[in-house]
Amino acid sequence: MLIKMQVGEQDRGELQVNVTDSDNAPIRDARVTISEPETAINPNSPIERLETDVSGQTQIVDLNTPPLEYSLNENNENMPYANYNIQIEVPGYETENIRNVEILPDSLSLQNVRMRKREGEQVENIDIDPHTLYAEYPEKIPEDEIKDVNEPGEIVLSRVVIPEYVVVHDGTPSSNARDYYVTYKDYIKNVASSEIYATWPRATIEANVLAIMSFTLNRVYTEWYRNKGYDFTITSSTAYDQKWIYGRNIFQSIDEVVDEIFDQYLSRPDVRQPILTQYCDGKRVTCPNWLSQWGSCNLGEQGFGTLEIIRNYYGDDMYINTAEQISGIPASWPGYDLTIGASGQKVMQMQEQLDTIARVYTAIPRVSADGVFGEGTQLR
């Protein structure tokens, strides 16, 4: 039985939890408990107890949310989504506690959880940061939308490609933060769910997803951070890149858009690289010649199409292009062959990538990332 939220007007949103193991295989009979965040009024009592089916999925449950108009009105100051906490328990695996899962009205929220084998009595606690349109984050530092790739020492890819994985540095570039290997589509879905509301018009979601993907592919194509001496693709800092939140839920409307257009990006005539399409909320921060997130919502509600929204902000010479799809994490030649006897950071990076694949495809032996190219690495 659902417990009513302590708010006035209410709408309803939906939540489904998907549970897999480290090899991405579904886990059946996982125990999933949903509760409201603990307050003085609400002592964190469970409102739903569920179990996953053979596909590792719970049934879809209805949950209370704020009114729909909160997420469609840029002048609204109230939080437009509801927060819930989720606990996932599976015998032999670490317990997962995910706090502040976001539920929007008239939207299906998807919480994907990958369980890890238990070592002792470990528990992983994940706190999802607030949405960028509700909380305040550092403003984007402006950059040129087309990077000069002809400077001495600069290395770029030979073509525009869709990587299988991106490496996300969870902080500012120079911070001592953790790096995460994330599939490209999962990264885009995470960022879009963190940067815009899933309740917005379809054309608005598509326009924003295109801007997010083009920005990301510019970082991939120019090897922006690699050329600065880093071994990651992009950061989670809004001052430098885009907001990515470890462990957060995504939304079905965004999930479907990304699956349909994930191989697209934004181009200008006679420019090979994807355009670094910068954007801002358009409310707390204004950004001439960048996409305004709230402004794009208003245009979508007026009936503007995806490309019309894009060109309204970036100009009439912006068009949609399609990239190739490749496996792994694209990188240019490091200056030496990676073969028996080679060593160093690039060998270690390759070993880490091989080990990431081996964790999913269990027929492939695991490899130790020691930075030395030996026979064990050659056999993979």
Predicted segments — roles?
Residues 67-99:
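A short, solvent-exposed loop/turn motif at the edges and junctions
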Residues 2-8, 29-31, 51, 57-63, ...:
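Conserved, single-site charged/polar hotspot
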Residues 22-47, 54, 347, 351:
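Short, ordered, surface-exposed loop/turn motifs in non-cytosolic proteins
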Residues 40-72:
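Short, acidic Ser/Thr/Gly-rich low-complexity loop/linker segments typical of extracellular
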Residues 10-12, 25-27, 45, 79-81, ...:
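Short, surface-exposed loop/turn motifs at beta-strand boundaries within globular domains
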Residues 1-27, 42-44, 50:
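Beta-strand-rich domain onsets/edges
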Residues 14, 83-85, 110:
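Broad gene-expression machinery/nucleic-acid interaction feature
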